[in-house]
């Protein structure tokens, strides 16, 4: 709204000035002018007392234009009057005021004002504001209205706050009026003006006088500095922190070009840089330059890279190192740069200025305050490497593209990441090596990878990419990102190939394969019980000791554990055959003491004609165990023919192992989940003895059937076993095994194995239904 009001006010003030200039020749009495003007100003002051300072110029502009009309010549207020118009009005009022005052011929200061750069800068700045989106940070942070009005308000505030010194300004103005008034003009005009000012509204008039005097004392220092500050975008430094983005960009190249002796090829570039005189114009051009010159710069750079690569190849094929030109080049390079980067310009002399040589050698930012980029935040700067490339190629069109040390000092992340001050000459030397490799093959001592694995003959695992491709393309330049890219790719290839070769050369670590345990079979554990049984449970475990011709085996049933344990005397003839599926209840489960059943103890003396032996036969697949009591004579317990499955000391069966401790298998008890027991009619050895078996009628722990063991020599001691008598009964959940207390006295074997068992029914978990039906045999 304020800007709109200002524009409408400008139009109205220009119209008023036209009207007053037209009406002024009709007035003849100069003495009446102050009074009439005073009345006009009082009227305007009364109308616009509540308005902004811009609206107070309604009475100001026609007044002073009329005062500048007398014949005696221009009054000293003429120039200041127009300055006030220029100060309080925008650009639209200035041409109108100049055209309005031109016919009178009295506006002396108008020509000087029209040529002042301050107004143009201010005007260009206001026209320059809509182009701000070229600078993203500034465009986002500062709205357009804020830019166009804030500084102007500050200007008006600084200028109009001088009304405190009203009397001093009036006195100085009157003194200057007396000194500067021509001879034809009486000095009474100054006094009349003072009296008019006293008679008028002192606030508005003294404000006008103070403004005019302020501008007259410091003519354009404040305004030019202010306009230059605004137009050159230095004000952005205080507002957004992005200062000196474009303003100094037009001046820095000219300063650099003045430092050293300029070559004729550099002079037109310097003139081009100096052409934008006004900071606003220069800033506008700098804003437009990225969009206009981006594609053309890249195309020129690409062509120059190709030309320089071809030129460098031709130079490398010739004896350029032995030529006097090459020696002079080396000497001058040592003198100018003072660095170790000798192969920067192998085909031509260094640039004629120390500035160019210092820039080309890639010295850090702190060492070159003049060549420092003006863009601190990654914005486009005036002398980007693209423009520098144009200058160098214009100086020597066939030179290698070694003048591109880095993109800029303001955002080269790869350069900052991989930059190492100790390896400054790596970039240009890498270019020469690439070109020389494309011509004469790879160098012998050149490491092809940054991280090469020493694995014998395959040291250089990752060969460098084709140098012919590199030398002909964009990667031929000294762009640091190219080196980083090559290093990264080469390193990845080297690491990958190194790992592959290492894995190929190193035999695979043979993981310790678990011993080929037999397939899951009934448990047969091979060690002595570590501790005696629980004293609360009277079971001591049925221990049967038999001394055969070759071996002595002892089988123990620790009641506190779920697995049977066996100990072999001379050989480890028993192997643990256990199918462990994570459930410890696969074995015989001992109930509590209250549920135990006490069985009668039968003692057989040595003189009796019968003895009792418990023989367990394991089938070929070791899934059926038959426990039978065999009765034999005192002199002959049994023969190897009676044993159906005695085939050796340790015979591996289908899924387990069968035990044959000598001629007779005694006391081998297997921890199984299901047992199949043959009844009397199905017993394969019925002729030698009667095996009496019972199946419990009820599944309670206290209900078991038992048969008293006869004392006849041909009768066997009964062993009550609760098991599934047929495969159809394998689905039973609770099976009980009753082991009587046995005292075995084999007459043929020396030691007497005493077995006392306070037997308790032991619960057996059923076998899975898919297992093969068990087989058992009773041997006498």
UniProtKB/Swiss-Prot annotation:
For bias type Basic and acidic residues, the affected ranges are 20-32
Q: Name one GO cellular component term.
A: plasma membrane
Picking any one GO molecular function of the record gives: lipid binding
Question: By its UniProt entry, which InterPro entries does this protein fall under?
Answer: AMER (IPR019003)
Q: Name one Pfam family in it.
A: AMER
Q: What is its main location?
A: membrane
The listed locations are: Cell membrane
Its Gene Ontology biological processes?
Wnt signaling pathway
Q: Look up the domain of life of the source.
A: Eukaryota
Give start-end positions of Polar residues composition bias: 354-376, 602-617, 753-763
Sorted keywords for this record are: Cell membrane, Lipid-binding, Membrane, Wnt signaling pathway
Q: What are the boundaries of the region Disordered?
A: 20-59, 341-407, 547-569, 582-617, 635-659, 706-729, 749-780
Q: Topology with regard to the membrane?
A: Peripheral membrane protein
Family membership, please give it.
Belongs to the Amer family.
Outline what the protein does: Regulator of the canonical Wnt signaling pathway. Acts by specifically binding phosphatidylinositol 4,5-bisphosphate (PtdIns(4,5)P2), translocating to the cell membrane.
Protein name per the record: APC membrane recruitment protein 3
Organism of origin: Mus musculus
Q: What is the lineage of its organism?
A: Eukaryota, Metazoa, Chordata, Craniata, Vertebrata
Gene name, please?
A: Amer3
